[in-house]
Design a protein with these regions (language model features):
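Boundary/entry segment of secreted carbohydrate-active catalytic domains
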Residues: 23-51, 196-197
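Metal-dependent polysaccharide deacetylase catalytic core of the NodB/CE4 family, i.e.
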Residues: 36-38, 58-162, 170, 179-193, ...
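Solvent-exposed, polar/charged alpha-helical surfaces in well-ordered, non-transmembrane soluble domains
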Residues: 51, 55, 83, 126, ...
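Bacterial N-terminal signal peptides
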Residues: 5-16
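Boundary at the C-terminal end of the N-terminal hydrophobic targeting segment
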Residues: 16-24
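C-terminal domain-boundary segment and adjacent tail
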Residues: 24-32, 64, 74, 140, ...
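Active-site metal-binding loops of divalent metal-dependent hydrolases
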Residues: 42-45, 96, 227, 259
Length: 277
């Protein structure tokens, strides 16, 4: 398990290092001569993450980021297994306590499943800040980590009509948003608003195509998964395994790691570039 000190040292080392010699000067310098990066994230703390996603990741020699809300039933029932998952090198990320969301998504579609008590329309920035801060303490008790990342619930970034992105900035190394796209301009990326693709009921070929796009553009592809082989907003286990197999086969050119590890490198490179200007 990586400590906060190790991560901060990683940031310092990455900032001091120059771009890989194999990379063109205009390309973002990924570690080990890789030409792109991929992050695999899993939302909502589900049983299928413990039963399917994590074992399949480990079989492929990969690690993922699991965004667990405090009210997750799986977390309550299987807490020792979630602690063990973190001990095996996976990241536990903050997904608030009560998974608050807006009533309507960006497309104007209603989310009738959101309880009235947890509508972001009725939250204040202070309330979401304090809820997320409390969840950080819960996660600290689980894995001992001080450096944390966040995933905006439902990819929503406002509380009571006011953006809460900047209010969370002091609490996190980085935060995952939505937009169903990759980050092609990594140097100009806001670490607190990293785009991701919410993959739902798609096959392995389409999942791999998203990773290939990152490779073609030298960018960062963040996958946003929910259920794996079951539960809600699912992707089949077979499709998930096909993606993992492709990533394992292409590990020399595509760096796949946790959101925390990848964003520690991105932030370090951004700081190094700013210091040179």
């Amino acid at each position: 398990m990586r400590t906060a000190a190790v991560l901060l040292a990683l940031v310092g080392l990455a900032a001091a290092a120059g771009p890989a010699s194999a990379q063109p000067s205009t390309a973002f310098p990924w570690p080990g001569g890789a030409r792109a990066a991929v992050v695999l994230t899993y939302d909502d703390g589900m049983d299928t993450h413990l039963d399917h996603a994590a074992p399949d990741l480990e079989a492929a020699g990969l690690r993922g980021t699991f965004y667990v809300p405090g009210h997750s039933e799986s977390l309550a029932r299987r807490l020792p297994e979630w602690r063990a998952l973190a001990a095996r090198g996976h990241e536990l990320g903050n997904h608030a306590i009560f998974h608050p969301c807006l009533r309507q998504n960006a497309k104007g579609e209603r989310r009738d499943w959101v309880q009235p008590e947890y509508l972001l329309e009725s939250y204040t920035v202070r309330r979401i800040h304090d809820e997320v801060l409390a969840m950080n303490t819960t996660l600290l008790a689980l894995d001992g980590e001080q450096v944390r990342t966040f995933a905006y619930n439902c990819c929503d970034t406002t509380a009571g009509g006011v953006s809460y992105i900047d209010a969370l900035r002091p609490l996190f190394l980085a935060a995952r948003g939505g937009e169903d796209r990759l980050a092609a301009d990594v140097r100009g990326l806001d670490p607190m608003l990293v785009p991701s693709w919410a993959a739902t009921e798609v096959g392995g070929e389409k999942l791999i195509a998203f990773a290939r796009e990152a490779l073609d553009k030298g960018g960062l592809a963040v996958f946003q998964f929910h259920g794996i082989g079951g539960e809600w907003i699912p992707v089949s286990r077979e499709a998930h395994q096909q993606l993992l197999a492709w990533l394992a086969q292409n590990r020399a050119s595509v760096w796949t790691d946790t959101f925390r590890q990848v964003m520690a490198h991105v932030v370090a490179e951004q700081k190094r570039g700013a210091a040179q200007r």
